[in-house]
Amino acid sequence: DAFVLSSPEYHGTMSGVMKNNLDWLSSEQASGKVFGLMSTLGGRTNSNTLNHMRIVARWVHGWVVPEQVAIGNVESAFDESGQLIEESIRNRVSGLAESLVTSTVKLRR
């Protein structure tokens, strides 16, 4: 009932692997489903990849929640155990997950 899309950003857009996967996603599979979006970047945070994934999700008639997460400087964003270091980013990921679940439940009614 929901999708979480997460992609690294390469040359200002989603990865080729993500784009290829989305090219195979049909509106029959995605119509009415809820989408949550995340991206990672080697440098400063921006919204290019998130915006491009949003366009594709809308094109296949999906509902994208307004919360989104972009993790910049990804090489230093996680500790040795793979946990996000910054509490503000952890809170944003939690907020995205909460919005995704809440929206999915509401659309199923």
Question: What positions do the PLM features span?
Answer:
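Glycine-rich phosphate/pyrophosphate-binding loop and the adjoining helix
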Residues: 63-109
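Helix-loop-strand module that forms the ligand-binding subsite of alpha/beta enzymes
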Residues: 1-60
